[in-house]
Amino acid sequence: MAASSSSGRRRYDVFPSFSGVDVRKTFLSHLIEALDGKSINTFIDHGIERSRTIAPELISAIREARISIVIFSKNYASSTWCLNELVEIHKCFNDLGQMVIPVFYDVDPSEVRKQTGEFGKVFEKTCEVSKDKQPGDQKQRWVQALTDIANIAGEDLLNGPNEAHMVEKISNDVSNKLITRSKCFDDFVGIEAHIEAIKSVLCLESKEARMVGIWGQSGIGKSTIGRALFSQLSIQFPLRAFLTYKSTSGSDVSGMKLSWEKELLSEILGQKDIKIEHFGVVEQRLKHKKVLILLDDVDNLEFLKTLVGKAEWFGSGSRIIVITQDRQFLKAHDIDLVYEVKLPSQGLALTMLCRSAFGKDSPPDDFKELAFEVAKLAGHLPLGLNVLGSSLRRRGKKEWMEMMPRLRNGLNGDIMKTLRVSYDRLHQKDQDMFLCIACLFNGFEVSYVKDLLEDNVGLTMLSEKSLIRITPDGHIEMHNLLEKLGREIDRAKSKGNPGKRQFLTNFEDIHEVVTEKTGTETLLGIRLPFEEYFSTRPLLIDKESFKGMRNLQYLKIGDWSDGGQPQSLVYLPLKLRLLDWDDCPLKSLPSTFKAEYLVNLIMKYSKLEKLWEGTLPLGSLKKMNLLCSKNLKEIPDLSNARNLEELDLEGCESLVTLPSSIQNAIKLRKLHCSGVILIDLKSLEGMCNLEYLSVDCSRVEGTQGIVYFPSKLRLLLWNNCPLKRLHSNFKVEYLVKLRMENSDLEKLWDGTQPLGRLKQMFLRGSKYLKEIPDLSLAINLEEVDICKCESLVTFPSSMQNAIKLIYLDISDCKKLESFPTDLNLESLEYLNLTGCPNLRNFPAIKMGCSDVDFPEGRNEIVVEDCFWNKNLPAGLDYLDCLMRCMPCEFRPEYLVFLNVRCYKHEKLWEGIQSLGSLEEMDLSESENLTEIPDLSKATNLKHLYLNNCKSLVTLPSTIGNLQKLVRLEMKECTGLEVLPTDVNLSSLETLDLSGCSSLRTFPLISKSIKWLYLENTAIEEILDLSKATKLESLILNNCKSLVTLPSTIGNLQNLRRLYMKRCTGLEVLPTDVNLSSLGILDLSGCSSLRTFPLISTNIVWLYLENTAIGEVPCCIEDFTRLRVLLMYCCQRLKNISPNIFRLRSLMFADFTDCRGVIKALSDATVVATMEDSVSCVPLSENIEYTCERFWGELYGDGDWDLGTEYFSFRNCFKLDRDARELILRSCFKPVALPGGEIPKYFTYRAYGDSLTVTLPRSSLSQSFLRFKACLVVDPLSEGKGFYRYLEVNFGFNGKQYQKSFLEDEELEFCKTDHLFFCSFKFESEMTFNDVEFKFCCSNRIKECGVRLMYVSQETEYNQQTTRSKKRMRMTSGTSEEYINLAGDQIVADTGLAALNMELSLGEGEASSSTSLEGEALSVDYMITKEQDEDIPFLDPVSDGTWRSFYSAE
């Protein structure tokens, strides 16, 4: 078959090329009729006059057809018209990918292909006659077309049954080739995978009539998949119908069935007036017809029986597809071929959501987390994804965030409407079970829920209707949207009164009902999810909280309080089946509680001293869990607990005995008594069904006389067992796991025991154990741990039968001398022999071991030759293997991973080894190794580690054969002097030569390298790296001999990180390059570097600490992506361009201890248009401290959480006045600089760390209040407490807010008093009120001040005009200007001159409280909207948190 046709509009489905004399009235007419019957549009020539050249309309028809059918017949080659058509078809086949079907009608395909025989004679005659009338090369084009088209697989009448059969086959083939997916389904993500899977079940090539079911939960997309499938298959089935079942009511069953049959036949036969008067017409009319029937949303078995009773009702090749949510309908109708529609994967679900919400396959970067959460809230259900996505379409991020609480807590109405249909179809009892699972038991074990609900049928019904799923490990899984549906249905019944619901699952509702005692008889279950156990609010339960809940059956809560809970209850509902109360404060259950219906009693970590008095009717009780109830002194009488299956008393420290009545619990299977100091275990002698016993205590008394253990024990856990040996009557036939660690056992038992089920044996730390029992019958043993069995001398040879052994730990068996030989442990994955100093032979074992730890403290290990055979496993790790040399018979041809770290010899082996399987080799720490082995045949090696091989001088040239090598590490190879030249390791991405202190030159050994580490080497210059165009990271730290970088570094346009820390010889960097991808540049400690680096304007993180740079130049404004600039301890730095304040992205700038800084070149334009984005973070003088703090991983991308922003000029004592003023006016984020006096324009000031301000009315008309604060901090004195950050606490209208700014520990690096500035805002409540400020840090705050700020609504031009018209008196150099202060006018900040503004109000004295009366006192300065966006909000704090602290002073 030819390649598929190119996309685009086509006028015709089929173009036929034929000889009219041979086939027009016979074969062709039949074929056109068959194609027309399948609605296939075929070109018909309608008597176009034929000549030697084909007509233009024919050329157009050929090109606009999707398929050409070429009918080769006896006289086809007699027509130049036909041959020229064929040339055009051949061209479309090659150029347009048109599909071509050749048909050989009474001719031999080989004669056509080779132009021989009768066909060849006709062709040659045509060529001879027309040679003068056709172009010279026309014959060659005819020959090529005949040869190529005849070579395509087609239909041959001579080899077929008959002409009719061939017509049908060709028409079907054409139909299949024309099938394309309907564009209506293009937006349904993943639908093609479903369709292909269903097609494989349908087996369309089969002639039998077949019924197939499509099954899945509501909203999963079954109907959509069905419609898409129907659309694709329709062209193959002229007789077809798609019917959706509609529920009907009424008693006329016969009429309903006749109506169904009429609808089906009308759809299939296309007749609207069909009359049906009796049943069975469907079978009669369609018995011999090939049909496609799809029945959707089937919820009635009679519907199926009436329309598609049996597959035999329909003709050969028919396909019946039934879509339903109920698996039982399919079973009842004997439909065994079922396709289950499952939830899409996380990736597909996200794509579905994004198609609906964003119209594309992935979310915008800033919507990723929200999109993931919405997809999760939809439970990956296609219906939910589509509905939620549509509801969020074309909404901004803020709107998404505002809608999230509603999506988390509720259920969309459209989703609920669709899912509710499934619930409404359930019988009442099944509806009750659905609600019970949705509200209480989603995610629980099936057996657990069956016991509580006493229903084995209901769960099966819900599962068959796709309302729940039973997981492979036996848990109930209900989709989260169905769970929300159930809870919404229950909530709706109560009409707003939680006490009248059936189930309570929300803390607030439970709190209300329990605290206010509003529970009613309707309430069946209370369950608080575990995540709400730790609510900050206590659940106040008193003695009568449960008194109104007469019918409560399920109670699962926890204790959240810090005290005040009752130690006793008056009443517990008598119908309780589940009592699950962790940390219960009760000392005992109420005496009125009878426990008659109780199935599960779970009271872990309780304060119980006893459960109840006397004997209660416990016939329903199956599980009792009192884990870690440390005050429990006795277990109640269990005489009536004949159905008890599990009893957990682990950690009940006060319990001393088990009641003799426990022997009546004949169904007890699990008993946990670890940590219980029992007097004796004789009461266990009647426990014939006990399978799980956990004792785990060394102080069990009366154990020496034990003569009986339950015979069906599967798991015995008895750590610290005081017995010397188990009794001879101990039965191990059913034993699966034996754990007796740190026991006093000397031996387990005598003789051979039937250990066929035993899988685990843990005897670790049994220091008296002298021998391991016979394990010859332990053929399923998988794990053995006898670590620290110090008395063990030999290991049993019977271990050889443990062919499934995976884990064997014999470490620290100090007396172990020998190990059995000839063990066949092919499954072994872990073997530990460390700490066995007397072991004189290594086990000669065949094994598939992936991890071997060898004995320590020996100079030589004798290894049997058979160990080193071709079965040597991949991943073998010879860690700390102190061999002198590898065994002479070592054959590593199957070795995948070779780790021989700390190898002691000078070479690994002699000659060339076959290493074709080797992928990783580690010879690190082999200090004596002078050469690595010949690796010329290790062509699959990907990772080679030679770290700390100090004697290694060079690498062999054969390393050039390692074309798959991805990573080469040679760190601290101090003897390495040269690398081989003229090699190109084409796959090498990481090369680490750091610490190779003798390496002076670096030849480029790979053009594919991405990470290159050359730090701490003796390299003097970097050679041409222009060919390393993939390089992303270049690390040259501590290359002290390096003076510069080559200009060819400009070719490295993928370089993202360049680290040159402490390259003390580096003087200059190239200036004529721009590394477009460079994000991190670290030149810290380059003490000879005098000029600001200009090798990239895209730098994000720039480290220039301890350099000799003298100026931050004006071109800093071009660094538009810069976020971090560290220049502390730059003693030669004198000038900083004010253009640094233009960088909106800059978040950190630190000039601490730049004591030579004199000024920041003032520029009135810069000040007037300032867009505050400049901030900094404080750092210490210690460079290493900075590295640790900012880098996380040494060479990461630097994408850190920058947290607090900060602009630091600490200890910059030479800053002139203009520079200080410019810095202060430019920042509304934290700033630090030397100083001991708050600027006078801070209108509210006070001594100490707090002040109270009465706000002017004009400020309360703002939506938000904005403040700038200033503190004077004495770094040499201690404050009133320890704080990690400098904190602002703010009280307003009875509420408290808080914000943390710079890290407090940075203050210790200040040498004198410093000023700290910060800005913040919060939402105004439009109420005139006092506000309180309190500032906290670990050092003494001498003085504090605040001022109000306002956001201007004017343009920059209007602001400047307004400024020029205002009149005020201002001191600025020698000029004076006057401004009137009246009414609500606000003085705009006009740059540097405004800093010296003298308010006519006077300065006054600072005090602990400031109240400035009068509207004129609202004078302050304007900020732009852009500046306001950078000001952080204060965070609200919980009631009392700050107030209590504030009052404590």
Curated annotation (Swiss-Prot):
The record's annotation in SUPFAM superfamilies points to: L domain-like, P-loop containing nucleoside triphosphate hydrolases, Toll/Interleukin receptor TIR domain, Winged helix' DNA-binding domain
Protein name from the UniProt record: Disease resistance protein RPP5
Oligomer status and interactors = Interacts with RSH1.
Matching entries from Pfam families are given as: C-JID, LRR_1, LRR_3, NB-ARC, TIR, WHD_ROQ1
Residue numbers annotated as active site: E85
* Record gene name: RPP5
| Enzyme type, top EC level | hydrolase
For this protein, the record's InterPro entries field holds: Apaf_helical (IPR042197), C-JID (IPR045344), Disease_R_plants (IPR044974), Leu-rich_rpt (IPR001611), Leu-rich_rpt_3 (IPR011713), LRR_dom_sf (IPR032675), NB-ARC (IPR002182), P-loop_NTPase (IPR027417)
Know anything about its domains from the record? The TIR domain mediates NAD(+) hydrolase (NADase) activity. Self-association of TIR domains is required for NADase activity.
> Which Gene3D superfamilies does UniProt cross-reference here?
Helical domain of apoptotic protease-activating factors, P-loop containing nucleotide triphosphate hydrolases, Ribonuclease Inhibitor, Toll/interleukin-1 receptor homology (TIR) domain
GO biological process annotation, one example: defense response
Q: Where is the TIR domain?
A: 10-178
Q: Please explain the role this protein plays, according to its UniProt record.
A: TIR-NB-LRR receptor-like protein that confers resistance to the pathogen Hyaloperonospora arabidopsis isolate Noco2 (downy mildew disease). Confers resistance to H.arabidopsis isolates Emoy2, Emwa1 and Noco2.
Q: Which sections of the protein are LRR repeats?
A: 549-573, 574-595, 597-618, 619-642, 644-665, 687-710, 712-732, 733-755, 756-779, 802-825, 826-849, 915-939, 941-962, 963-985, 986-1011, 1028-1052, 1053-1077, 1096-1119, 1120-1143
Keywords, A to Z, come to: ATP-binding, Hydrolase, Leucine-rich repeat, NAD, Nucleotide-binding, Plant defense, Repeat
The NB-ARC domain extends over 192-446
The record's EC number reads 3.2.2.6
Enumerate the GO terms in the molecular function aspect. ADP binding; ATP binding; NAD+ nucleosidase activity, cyclic ADP-ribose generating; nucleotide binding
Q: Which reactions are catalysed by this chain?
A: NAD(+) + H2O = ADP-D-ribose + nicotinamide + H(+)
